[in-house]
């Protein structure tokens, strides 16, 4: 993989996660100011997982079969950025509606979550040695999330509507940038795809394997405290008189460290013990 492609893919990953990190963990600090209730926050952080359930159908039926990956990526980010900017606009109205704002978040997430898979597809397609090159490219996504948090705290936007504008304009910029990424034809072009494959029903047979079942149950359980973290940690950090976005970004700093040492853990501990220590 040449230097030019490496830089372009690194920038892609950086902005991809900058968008998400710019608002997702600090949103409650502003939304509480405009009247969001506990139930409203519940929906704010439920629309993302719902969109994540829906998005594979879009990727399987359209993005993987009909259009070049970089073009789909560009269109989705432009639409998602527009939805986030509309949400920011609604927040500043005379009587902001939590329902309307959450619907805008849902529209944004419906566009954003497919791009997580699409950026991976695009990156892997344009690598000559994915096993070695992908981790080095993917780490720029984590750096993007970290820098988004630092920008928020540096500018004093931890509890400002400007965090949503930052995310929206970053998504629009990513949308434009995507059209200049390396051409990546749809991986499923010309292939017959059944509804069973799109729905992932063929994968259900894996649940017959005890090891896979345990892994899925563990993944399910570990996502429960993660959901509470996203919804509540920022307010706890703020009450401790710390900079919320900056302070919470250190979680991603530790992620970079563990991404570096993970190969050592694989060799010394094996998968089972590594997962046990992590959980």
Region locations from a protein language model:
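Structural signature of the two symmetry-related core transmembrane helices
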Residues: 71-86, 273-279
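Helix-loop boundary and gating motifs at the non-cytosolic
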Residues: 2-49, 211-249
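Symmetry-related core transmembrane helices of the 12-TM Major Facilitator Superfamily/SLC fold
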Residues: 148, 163-180
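Residue-level signature of mid-helix packing/kink "hotspots" within the transmembrane helices
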Residues: 49-57, 145-146, 252-260
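Juxtamembrane intracellular "pre-TM" segments in multi-pass secondary transporters
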Residues: 1-3, 181-217
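Hydrophobic core of transmembrane alpha-helices in multi-pass small-molecule transporters
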Residues: 14, 83, 96-118, 122, ...
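Helix-to-loop junctions at the C-terminal end of transmembrane segments
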Residues: 54-68, 156, 258-271
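Glycine-rich segments within core transmembrane alpha-helices of 12-TM secondary carriers
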Residues: 52, 131-152
């Amino acid at each position: 993989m040449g230097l030019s492609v490496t830089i372009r893919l690194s920038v892609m990953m950086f902005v991809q996660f900058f968008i998400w990190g710019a608002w997702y963990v600090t949103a409650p600090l502003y939304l509480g100011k405009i009247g969001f209730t506990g139930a409203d926050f519940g929906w704010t952080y439920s629309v993302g997982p719902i969109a994540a359930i829906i998005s594979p159908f879009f990727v399987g039926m359209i993005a993987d079969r009909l259009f070049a990956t970089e073009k789909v990526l560009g269109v989705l980010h432009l639409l998602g950025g527009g939805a986030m900017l509309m949400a920011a606009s609604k927040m500043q109205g005379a009587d902001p509606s939590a329902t309307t704002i959450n619907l805008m978040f849902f529209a944004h997430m419906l566009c954003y979550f497919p791009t997580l898979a699409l950026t991976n597809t695009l990156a892997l397609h344009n690598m000559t040695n994915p096993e070695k090159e992908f981790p080095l490219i993917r780490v720029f996504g984590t750096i993007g999330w970290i820098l988004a948090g630092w920008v928020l705290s540096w500018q004093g936007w931890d509890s400002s509507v400007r965090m949503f504008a930052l995310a929206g304009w970053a998504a629009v910029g990513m949308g434009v940038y995507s059209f200049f990424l390396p051409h990546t034809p749809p991986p499923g072009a010309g292939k017959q795809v059944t509804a069973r494959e799109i729905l992932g029903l063929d994968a259900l047979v894996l649940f017959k394997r005890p090891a896979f079942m345990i892994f899925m149950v563990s993944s399910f359980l570990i996502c429960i405290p993660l959901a509470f973290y996203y919804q509540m940690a920022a307010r706890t950090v703020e009450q401790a008189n710390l900079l919320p976005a900056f302070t919470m970004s250190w979680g991603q700093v530790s992620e970079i460290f563990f991404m570096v040492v993970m190969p050592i853990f694989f060799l010394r501990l094996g998968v089972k013990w590594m997962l046990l220590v992590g959980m």
